[in-house]
UniProtKB/Swiss-Prot annotation:
EC numbers, comma separated: 2.7.4.6, 2.7.13.3
Name of the protein described by the UniProt record: Nucleoside diphosphate kinase B
List of residues binding ATP: 12, 60, 88, 94, 105, 115
Subcellular location: Cytoplasm; Cell projection, Lamellipodium; Cell projection, Ruffle; Nucleus
Organism from which the protein derives: Sus scrofa (Pig)
Enzyme class: transferase
Pfam families on file: NDK
Gene that encodes the chain: NME2
Function of the molecule: Major role in the synthesis of nucleoside triphosphates other than ATP. The ATP gamma phosphate is transferred to the NDP beta phosphate via a ping-pong mechanism, using a phosphorylated active-site intermediate. Negatively regulates Rho activity by interacting with AKAP13/LBC. Acts as a transcriptional activator of the MYC gene; binds DNA non-specifically. Binds to both single-stranded guanine- and cytosine-rich strands within the nuclease hypersensitive element (NHE) III(1) region of the MYC gene promoter. Does not bind to duplex NHE III(1).
Amino acid sequence: MAHAERTFIAVKPDGVQRGLVGEIIKRFEQKGFRLVALKFLQASEELLKQHYIDLKDRPFFPGLVKYMGSGPVVAMVWEGLNVVKTGRVMLGETNPADSKPGTIRGDFCIQVGRNIIHGSDSVKSAEKEISLWFKPEELVEYKSCAFDWIYE
């Protein structure tokens, strides 16, 4: 396989509360991506402010941090060929109204403020987000038995 990359995916509090964690994991697994890390946690305000630092000057920033801290989240790292780009396609548009049926947001969301999932928007962002949410030793290295059936 060509260079595999990693992406950071987080099921937001609304996705956890609505019982969509399993469905989201299922979609990434069925696509052929490999889960290398997973945490179920109540994110601290400090962690969330660091995660969304690029949005700190936007008017919705305080509300976003409050919403993301309102309940538990599921933080994950997925690996595979073009996983950042493909993962974003699987998520759908940030605004669910613009998301196509078949995408996670297109199938399960109505409003942008409750769009159930976050996914890294670039390889650089993924690296930053992964290092923010996970220690290096929390990323598990293994070869999936399905690997040879997914990649040439």
